[in-house]
Design a protein with these regions (language model features):
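Short terminal interaction segments
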Residues: 79-145
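Extended, charge-rich alpha-helical scaffolding segments
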Residues: 2-69, 73, 81
Length: 145
């Protein structure tokens, strides 16, 4: 039983750490100028924490099978309180992560539009001082045969 309580405590602590990371991610995404390196670091942190959560949840389910118990653990008040916190945190994290996904989608769309504008201006045809068409500073000569 002590191992189960320890696993549940670690699960709650890991979810709290994930909450901080996801909130930091949201701050970066809302800042207007997204720092790609910082976002990459956060993605790595999230992946690591989610792998830990998955491992701890598997341990929890194994303990449940062995001890013939199941969530919400109403017969064990200490564990029931931790389970309630796990449910609340996962609900909150899911909502924030969904919102961050929308923010990230908007940032990707913005970057895609900016790249399209930049690429279009590079292929735009102009006339040089000699009257010939130029493409981004290169003279294009038409030869008739």
């Amino acid at each position: 039983m002590k191992n189960f309580i320890k696993s549940m405590t670690t699960l709650v602590e890991t979810l709290q750490a994930l909450d901080q990371v996801i909130n930091h991610e949201q701050t970066i995404l809302c800042s207007g100028r997204v720092n790609g390196a910082a976002l990459q670091h956060i993605t790595e942190q999230k992946s690591s924490l989610l792998a830990t959560v998955d491992y701890l949840d598997k341990q929890r389910r194994q303990h449940d099978e062995r001890l013939k118990q199941s969530a919400p653990y109403s017969r064990q008040p200490e564990i029931a309180a931790m389970w309630k916190e796990v449910v609340q945190l996962t609900t909150k994290l899911s909502q924030i992560n969904r919102h961050n996904g929308m923010l990230l989608g908007k940032q990707i769309a913005y970057n895609t539009e900016a790249l399209a504008i930049l690429n279009a201006s590079q292929t735009q045809k102009f006339y040089g001082p000699n009257g010939q068409e130029t493409v981004t500073g290169q003279t294009v000569r038409k030869i008739s045969v």
